Amino acid sequence: AHFLPPLUL
């Protein structure tokens, strides 16, 4: 999943 601040999990 992508979140802000940019994190790719």
From Swiss-Prot:
User: Where does this chain mainly localize?
Assistant: secreted
Q: Which cysteines are joined by disulfide bonds?
A: none
Q: Where in the cell is it found?
A: Secreted
The lineage's top-level taxon is Eukaryota
Q: Which UniProt keywords apply?
A: Antimicrobial, Secreted, Selenocysteine
Q: Which Gene Ontology cellular component terms are annotated? A: extracellular region
- Residue ranges annotated as transmembrane are none
Tissue/organ expression: Expressed by the venom gland.
Answer yes or no on keyword Secreted: yes
Keyword Secreted in record: yes
**So what does this one do?**
May have antimicrobial properties, like most ant linear peptides.
What is the designated name of this protein?
U1-poneritoxin-Dq2b
